[in-house]
């Protein structure tokens, strides 16, 4: 069982994230532009990045005009190649994992490539953000001092 010291350190660490979240709220457009630029930079040399010339995209407008919205079926062959081990299709670092959808269309599950960066910056960070918001709104919480039940995943 976690100690009070662990609880204090964990809650302090999680509360620090609130300042970043407040920055996102104050500057949503700038933050989104920065995220887009980072994603474009990281994918410039991928098959998709070369196909749509990500290296010459500097604005959201250019991205919107150059990169079409596609259905899963339109990229299914690329995803299947990725599942079989071909790298550098969608992302510049190795894809080792795939999220599996519940199959809401065509009654088939879909596989979504998941990079290590996606795990860190989306999946894991979302959990940390929820805890950060919880501690920010419940300053006297003793969440880490007792037992807890965690549920996760799909089939």
Each language-model region and where it sits:
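Nucleotide 5′-phosphate-binding alpha/beta core
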Residues: 1-100, 106-155
